[in-house]
């Protein structure tokens, strides 16, 4: 009987310790991911502002966003190893566009939803903890900024009129020269390629998972000793 009580007590102690560890880890993850989300929002907003400096900046802003946003997004994905990560990023990006006064057309909304679904499927197929799942998933998710830009190709005349009213005829005429299917294809290919390479670079050169694991093991050993 005493042995059974001891075993039950040990199980209860272990379960309490596990619950405390999970709570501590959840707080740690939140305190880590929240700044990364803010950085992601700031970078996306900066890219949107940059895109209106010149028509060429407008074209390269999508692959540029794929490069500079890789750091915060990859770190978020390495922490959040569950379904819905890209859906959350899509919602965050959509909120950023609303704050900036950018409206999504129906076709843009479809593109955004499609990008989110494809990104989620890629990570689900390749694994939520795998590097390839992060890299390929992020490569697909890098196309999110294309959501409100696709209007240039789906309804060129209306979009050009809008741009002319906001930035002038010169800007509108220069931007109109990029309204070809070849440019759209090149933007998609370039964005996916640099998105994958950027995510790969962050994973290879900013290894936090190993350090975190070692620290957790040390804490676990100290806990067991006590």
Which residues fall in each region the model found?
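Hydrophobic transmembrane alpha-helices
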Residues: 2, 13-84
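Aromatic-anchored segments of alpha-helical transmembrane domains
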Residues: 40-48, 91-102, 140-150
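Alpha-helical membrane segments and adjacent membrane-interface helices in multi-pass membrane proteins
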Residues: 61-121
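Membrane-embedded alpha-helical hairpins and interfacial helices in multi-pass inner-membrane proteins
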Residues: 134-208, 221
């Amino acid at each position: 009987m005493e042995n059974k009580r001891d075993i039950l007590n040990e199980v209860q102690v272990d379960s309490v310790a596990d619950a405390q560890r999970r709570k501590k880890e959840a707080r740690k993850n939140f305190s880590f991911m929240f700044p990364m989300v803010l950085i992601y929002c700031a970078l996306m907003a900066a890219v949107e502002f940059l895109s209106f400096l010149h028509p060429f900046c407008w074209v390269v802003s999508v692959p540029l966003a794929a490069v500079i946003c890789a750091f915060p997004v990859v770190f978020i994905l390495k922490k959040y190893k569950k379904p819905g990560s890209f859906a959350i990023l899509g919602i965050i990006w959509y909120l950023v566009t609303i704050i900036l006064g950018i409206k999504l057309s129906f076709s843009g909304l479809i593109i955004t939803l499609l990008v989110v679904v494809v990104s989620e499927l890629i990570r689900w197929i390749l694994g939520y903890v795998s590097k390839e799942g992060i890299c390929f998933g992020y490569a697909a998710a890098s196309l999110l900024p294309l959501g409100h830009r696709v209007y240039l190709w789906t309804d060129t005349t209306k979009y050009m009129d809008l741009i002319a009213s906001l930035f002038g005829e010169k800007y509108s005429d220069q931007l109109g020269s990029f309204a070809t299917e070849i440019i759209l294809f090149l933007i998609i290919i370039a964005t996916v390629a640099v998105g994958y390479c950027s995510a790969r670079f962050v994973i290879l050169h900013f290894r936090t998972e190993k350090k975190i694991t070692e620290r957790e093991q040390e804490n676990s050993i100290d806990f067991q000793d006590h």
